[in-house]
Amino acid sequence: MKPYLIGIAGPSCAGKSYLSTHLARHLNAAMLNLDSYYADLNHLSLAERAHFNFDAPEALDSCLLIEHVRQLSRGDAIEKPIYDFKNHSRTGQTERLEARSFILIEGLFALYWEEIRAVQATKVFVDLGEEICLARRIERDTRERGRTRESVLEQFQTTVRPMAQRYVHPTRQYADVVLTGDGEIDDELKLVLNHIKVGSSRGSGT
């Protein structure tokens, strides 16, 4: 049986990863995070990397991402790149990801590319108010990615907000399930699992 692919998209810090972690645990699913596919910026200085627009689809290596998603959809394993967020570059190492019966594709642009949507049997959009997303992003990036509060605020105002409005929020139209990122996780899981149950009974894919 072909793997059942689930796309989980939404604005930064809306709760995509939290939902994905719980869903992956419930389904024993493989999880592919789009953050691993940011383009390698080793050719740029550290100052240039710091001002790079990471919030547009062009920031990702979409060719590699699409190829890897297609491989996983066929049941093949991939060598996923490892990205260093402190230096804004790839480490040069990879992590092997084996296909499983269920595969989660999670990230800002999980519903953006038609080629990826075409192999997703369930598409989820997680939405949340901008102020809460910003507060979560400040907390995450200062703790996990070595950023200052000021740099996070500047990035949010210059690229995160406008790019979300241009590229992320419009992909909500493709979602089978729309969730709020501050809802009860058990309730949100139930909504997604119900759609997966229906989709699985019809066969994976679209």
Name these PLM-found stretches.
Residues 98-99, 139-142, 161-206:
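NTP-dependent small-molecule kinase module
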Residues 16:
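Conserved lysine of the Walker
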Residues 91-144:
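ATP-dependent NMP and nucleoside kinases share a basic, alpha-helical "lid"
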Residues 12:
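The conserved Walker
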Residues 30-31, 39, 43-87:
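Conserved nucleotide-sensing/catalytic segment adjacent to the nucleotide-binding pocket
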Residues 5-7:
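Short hydrophobic/aromatic beta-strand immediately N-terminal to the Walker A/P-loop
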Residues 19, 23:
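Hydrophobic positions on the alpha1 helix immediately C-terminal to the Walker A/P-loop
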Residues 25-33:
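Post-Walker A helix-loop "phosphate-sensing" segment adjacent to the P-loop in P-loop NTPases
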